[in-house]
């Protein structure tokens, strides 16, 4: 669909700025793109991981440029000198800024994909270790858990008394795997485990995910 002559994007090509304002616009766009990481990744996930650099991905670049231009033109942020500009803006400047934003967008997506791949690798490793004969402690992911006299312990310092007298390593492993697999259905990131509670409160083993903000009590 062709853009109207009065659209914010087209207006970018009908204004001019001194080198000072061009640099201000450029820096503002880059900062706005970095601050829009959550919005960009939502668009990326909704597009089911389409290749960065396509028209749908560059849509955020256009939005960022239009938003920053509108911010520069606001009464509070824009000196009178900028409001009086009328000459055509150098297209090469806008194209350079647009390309720089595209590169920043690709960098954000690439970093997200690397983090996602690392999380998936950690999840596979965690599940593989749990399927082994020994039950790896989910908190330190280093030492083996032991269950003796209804107390779950680990050399890392984990010490959790449990009410159930028939809790075994097999049952605890099954519980851990069930919760991790249930979480992975709706979130690809690896959850973390921690122990809460103090001297006046029974310690508990919790699973939580910093990405999707979900949590579950394991013990």
From Swiss-Prot:
Keywords: Metal-binding, Nucleus, Phosphoprotein, Ubl conjugation, Zinc, Zinc-finger. A zinc finger (RIP-type) spans 137-212. Pfam families: RPA_interact_C, RPA_interact_M, RPA_interact_N. The modification Phosphoserine is found at residue 18. It is found in: Nucleus. InterPro entries: RIP, RPA_interact_C_dom, RPA_interact_central, RPA_interact_N_dom. GO terms for molecular function: protein-containing complex binding; zinc ion binding. GO terms for cellular component: cytoplasm; fibrillar center; PML body. Its main location: nucleus. One of its GO terms (biological process) is DNA recombination. Sumoylated; required for localization in the nuclear PML body and transport of RPA complex in PML body. Upon UV irradiation and during S phase, it is desumoylated, releasing RPA complex that is translocated to sites of DNA damage. Sumoylation takes place at different Lys residues. Residues 164-180 are annotated as: Mediates nuclear export. It comes from the Eukaryota. Interacts with the RPA1 subunit of RPA complex. Mediates the import of RPA complex into the nucleus, possibly via some interaction with importin beta. Sumoylation mediates the localization of RPA complex into the PML body of the nucleus, thereby participating in RPA function in DNA metabolism. This is RPA-interacting protein. The lineage of its organism: Eukaryota, Metazoa, Chordata, Craniata, Vertebrata.
């Amino acid at each position: 669909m062709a853009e109207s002559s009065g659209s914010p994007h087209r207006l970018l090509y009908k204004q001019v700025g001194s080198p000072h304002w061009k640099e201000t616009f450029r820096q503002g766009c880059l900062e706005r793109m970095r601050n829009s990481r959550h919005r960009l990744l939502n668009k990326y996930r909704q597009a089911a991981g389409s290749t960065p650099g396509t028209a749908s991905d560059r849509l955020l670049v256009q939005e960022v440029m239009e938003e920053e231009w509108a911010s520069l033109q606001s009464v509070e942020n824009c000196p009178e000198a900028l409001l009086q500009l009328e000459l055509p803006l150098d297209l090469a400047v806008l194209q350079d800024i647009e390309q720089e934003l595209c590169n920043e967008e690709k960098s954000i997506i690439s970093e997200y994909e690397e983090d996602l791949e690392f999380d998936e690798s950690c999840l596979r490793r965690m599940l593989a270790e749990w399927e082994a004969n020994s039950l790896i402690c989910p908190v330190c992911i280093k030492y083996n858990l032991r269950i003796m006299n209804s107390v779950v312990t680990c050399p890392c310092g984990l010490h959790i008394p449990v009410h159930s007298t028939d809790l075994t390593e097999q049952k605890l492993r099954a519980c851990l795997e069930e919760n991790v697999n249930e979480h992975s259905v709706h979130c690809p990131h690896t959850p973390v485990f921690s122990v809460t509670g103090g001297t006046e409160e029974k310690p508990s083993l919790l699973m939580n995910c910093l990405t999707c903000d979900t949590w579950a009590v394991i013990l």
